[in-house]
């Protein structure tokens, strides 16, 4: 593609801890990323498109996911201490907590129950856990492995979704 004329992003308060990602929602472009405490949603010229006033405590290599909640698009990412942060495209945030997660968990998003909304898939040590975005548990299983890696999601069809795990 061509460089965007007028690209002039604001400076972050702290070093960036997530990938800089582009999402297109309802015919609008959103550039999203996070530093240690703030979440940024910019337009394609680097100006703030959505103000997120909440403060977070994020770990390095925070992943940001676009999914749906209640039929509406939202951005989801995890904080320290098992927190799940949900940010909508008006800048409103919701935070829930999943008890019993270490700071070494891995996370992905999957529509576990086929209802069209994202659910959170965690691996933590030898445990696999799926919760709703509000932290309500849907599934949990302990595996024989000592430490599970990132939980990959494979969608073969609308009704055939599988999770791939490594140890």
Regions found by a protein language model. Name each.
Residues 1-167:
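Extracytoplasmic/lumenal domain signature
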